[in-house]
Amino acid sequence: MSFIADKIVMDGLTYDDVLLIPAYSEVLPRTVDLSTKFSQNIELKIPFVTAAMDTVTEAKMAIAIAREGGIGVIHKNMSIEEQARQVAIVKRAENGMIYDPVTIKRGSTVRDALDIMAEYKIGGIPVVDDEGYLVGIVTNRDLRFERDMAKHIDLVMTPKERLVTTNQSTDLESAAQILQKHKIEKLPIVGMDGKLIGLVTYKDITKAKDKPMACKDAKGRLRVAAGVGVTVDTLDRMQALVDAGADAIVIDTAHGHSAFVIEKLREAKKRFPGIDIVVGNIATGEAAKALVEAGADAVKVGIGPGSICTTRVVAGVGVPQLSAVYDVAKALKGTGIPLIADGGLRYSGDVVKALAAGGYSVMIGSLVAGTEESPGDTIIFNGRKFKSYRGMGSLEAMENGSKDRYFQSGTADVKKLVPEGIAARVPYKGTLFEVVYQLTGGLRAGMGYCGAANIEKLHDAKFTRITNAGVMESHPHDVTITSESPNYSRPE
């Protein structure tokens, strides 16, 4: 037996190795359906998930992507309390009817009210007594010109007697009519006993009309996921995230096909049976089967394809991303478990290829790291604006808490860490909306060429393998680019 026959078990192809073959189409790009599943019980309006990276997704990014129809995964490089707080910010960013509104106790001060408004980015707070009975409401208009920070809010609030309220049987449409009729912005929901049980705001109703494709839960709140590692406090972190309202938990490791991850997944499903748990990362069908058997509600595919990942050169391990996605998709066929293709995406065409190979959604990092909503630092270099972007396997990220992702949580000495990623910078790209608009536009175009009316139909598309000459031919060539396109930059 030769080495090739004995040891090479598969061909490894990635996005630049193939093109999709155009097919007969009756599908216009503007009519395609981009809805898909993130996990077994969470639907998305667009197939985009922002990565659980400390220079990509915190509350601001998660809110922005959910408003566009995707979902964000808040990273874990922070304390349990801070990550739970980030989740809570997303869940409170928009609501249909708010059934657990932020409140302030009677007797609190103007300073207390201003601090709460700043923390939760809200413009008004119901005032309650110690038993939870509504006694008034205080808004930023009440506090705008107030100079005495120690003054009790009872002296500046609008008392209950002057408030318009409603009961819990009022639906959202009726609530909107009440708000309009009385020209008010906040409508408290009060029980028969006088206790505050909820709140409807004009701002939330307006947001719902402005972003009809937003990814929301049954209560009208934006959906959000949160990442955890495999450590001694994993279940404690998960409990805090679930309590804060997280819609899904992502067990995020460099090697999802390991005994430690599978055991932690089983423990998590037993303790939290009502929440979807996504697990990654993996690169083989065998790994997918093991995770599904252990209870995974979705799997995340990608070992080493990311622009800031060095796993393949440091460890010599990985599977080119397109082949990995296809291998996992084959293994998952008939299970109903969605596949998230994570990493290696440079252009919208790569997104089309990832979904055509069997993905339900794609996880994006570098494509959105340069946006206004990312938490990365802004850098000016040679007169141009950039944002910092680093792999969770970079030395800097590992020092801040991601060591466990690479099974190095027991290494205390920074000099003994073995990084599997780098720190970098990416060009500033404006708002997330602008980037997502171009990505969805390219995806719609690709689906139109393939005659695929939805993502499920896109899974039937066929590929042609191309040479390096084919790759060169695919990019602009034999010219000097004089005007940059918003969705294309020449590969370095």
Model-derived regions, located:
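Short beta-strand/loop segments at the ligand-binding rim of alpha/beta enzyme cores
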Residues: 43-50, 96-101, 217-227, 268-283, ...
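Bateman/CBS regulatory modules and CBS-like beta-alpha motifs in cytosolic regions of diverse proteins
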Residues: 30-44, 51-53, 82-120, 127-129, ...
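Alpha/beta catalytic cores of nucleotide-metabolism and tRNA/nucleoside-modifying enzymes
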Residues: 1-24, 104-105, 167, 174-177, ...
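Glycine-rich phosphate-binding active-site loops on the catalytic face of alpha/beta enzymes
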Residues: 67-82, 246-258, 297-315, 345-379
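Catalytic beta/alpha-barrel core
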Residues: 73-77, 103-104, 124-126, 165-166, ...
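Active-site-adjacent beta->alpha loops and helix N-cap segments on the catalytic face
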Residues: 30, 79-88, 146-150, 171, ...
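Short beta->alpha transition motifs characteristic of CBS
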Residues: 74-79, 122, 126, 133-149, ...
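Catalytic cores of alpha/beta
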Residues: 60-63, 236-244, 283-301, 341, ...
